[in-house]
C-alpha cells in the first residue's frame, strides 16, 4: 500500500482511477478488502452507539462498516473496541526531547495518529532551517505530523533569541502540504496594539487556521484578539475562562502536559453539548511521563475516571479535533475516512492494543522503513564561560522580587521577600525556599546574564540547568550556590545543551540535547531513562516539583503571567515591562 496524505496525492491519474475502483468494489463487498477488522465493536461518534461490525480497509481508507466483509488480511479484534485515531491539536515535539522520528515511535503506538505541532522551539534557535527540519521529518514519519508555522519568533523583544522570523520568512512555507496555518499567536499585546509585524502575519493568513495563545485575556480585549481571525485557545486554565472563550466562538483545546495540567479544571466543560467545540492537546510532554502515564490515552482515561461521558471525550480526541483544523478526511470510523484506527481494551481503559495509521498496522518494521532526516543545529550553544562572580547581586537592599512557582502551572506569582544582604550581595534563603535563578544568552549575540530569585523549587543545595527555556532557549539555571550555578551553566556548553544537575561542583546527572540544544540524537527509551535519573538527582537536591525541568523551562517565557526573567532582566508580564529586583 502506498502511503500519502491523500490516496491521489502522489499517484498518476490513471492509478488514482484504479484505486477509486478498488475502493468502490471493496466497500460494496464485491472484492476482498485489503484489511478487515473482524469480531469487534466500534464507537460511532455520531450516534454514540457501540456497533458490532466488521471494518473494511482499502489502501489508506476505511471503505466499509455496518456489514460483514472478507479480507486479504483479517485481524481478529473480538472483545475489543475500535475508535478513531487520536489527534493532538497543539504540541511542541521538541519538548519531548527527541526528534520527530523518535516522537513518532514513542506516541503512535499509544494511538496518536495525527499531531499538529508548532516548531517554534527550534525556530527560535535556528530560524527557517528549524522549520524546514520539521517539515522534512513530517514527510517521513508514519504518523501524520502537521505543522503550524511559528508566528512569534521571538515571542517578544524582551529576550534574545537565536533567530527572528518575519512574514517574508514564513511565506515560502505557507503552501507546503504539511502546513495548516499559523501557530499560537503569543504576542497578544502586539495584536491589540496593532503592531505592524503582527498585522502583516495576521493579514497573510486570514482565511487559514490561526492558533491562539491568550492566558487570562478576557472581556473586550479578548473580542479584539478573536476579531483578528484567531480561532483556538489552549491556555484556558479554568472553566469560567474556557466558557467565555467558547461563547465568543473560540475552540478550546483542553491541555494536559508535563507542567501545564488543566484537564481537571476544565472537566466541567467537557460535555456532549460542548464537545464539538473542544479538542485535546498536550503542549509539552516528556517521554518519561508518556511512558509512565501515556499521551492522549492518559487524558481520555483520566477524564472518564473524573466523570466525563466517554462520548464527549472521544469526540474531542478525534472528530472534533479534525473539524477544528479542517482535516475532514479523518476522525470517524466510517467509509471514506482515513484509516487511522485504535483498537482499545475498553472505552474506560483506553489501552491501545493495535494501531493503524493510514491503513497500515503500526509495527517496529514500519518505523524501520522510514528515511532518516539529516541532523541540524549542532554546536548551537555559544554562551560565554561564567564564574560564581557573574551571579552575585549588587543590590544593597534586601527587599527583593521573586518568581513564585505554581506547581502544575506555567503561570507564576510576583512575590517579594526581605532577604539578607551579605558580602556578595543579596543571598538566597533556603529556609524559606528562595534560591537564585539566572538566564544566560547562549546564541553568541551579546553574552547577557540576568539574575533574580525564585520561590517554590525546594532546593537545599546544588543547581539544575537547562537550554530548554521557552521560547528563546537561553541557558536557565536555578541554584542554591553561585559556584554550582556556574558549574551547571558551563557544563551545558560542553555537552551542546541539555539538562544538568550539579552539587558541590560535581555533575550528578545530565542529558545532552545536541540538536539545537533541544533534542537528543538517542532513542526515546534512552532519553526516558536519563530523565528518570535527572528527576532523582533533582529530588536529592531537595526539589519538590513533579517536573522540575519543564517547570524551569517556563521561567523565562515573558508572555505568561505574572513575573518572568529573560537574559535582559525581570519582566512584569502584566505590565509588559522590565522591573528591578
UniProtKB/Swiss-Prot annotation:
Output the Pfam families linked to this UniProt entry.
Adenine_deam_C, Amidohydro_1
Q: Work out whether the entry's keyword set contains tRNA-binding.
A: no
Alphabetical keyword list: Hydrolase, Manganese
Which ranges of the sequence are coiled-coil? none
Which GO MF terms does the UniProt record name?
Answer: adenine deaminase activity
**What GO biological process terms are annotated to this protein in UniProt?**
adenine catabolic process
Kindly list the cysteine pairs connected by disulfide bridges. Answer: none
Q: Which reaction does it catalyse?
A: adenine + H2O + H(+) = hypoxanthine + NH4(+)
Q: What class of enzyme is it?
A: hydrolase
Name the domain of life. Answer: Bacteria
**Which cofactor(s) are needed, names only?**
Mn(2+)
Q: What EC number is given for this enzyme?
A: 3.5.4.2
Family affiliation: Belongs to the metallo-dependent hydrolases superfamily. Adenine deaminase family.
Q: Mind telling me which HAMAP family this protein's record contains?
A: Adenine_deamin
Protein name, please?
Answer: Adenine deaminase
Taxonomic source organism: Brucella melitensis biotype 1 (strain ATCC 23456 / CCUG 17765 / NCTC 10094 / 16M)
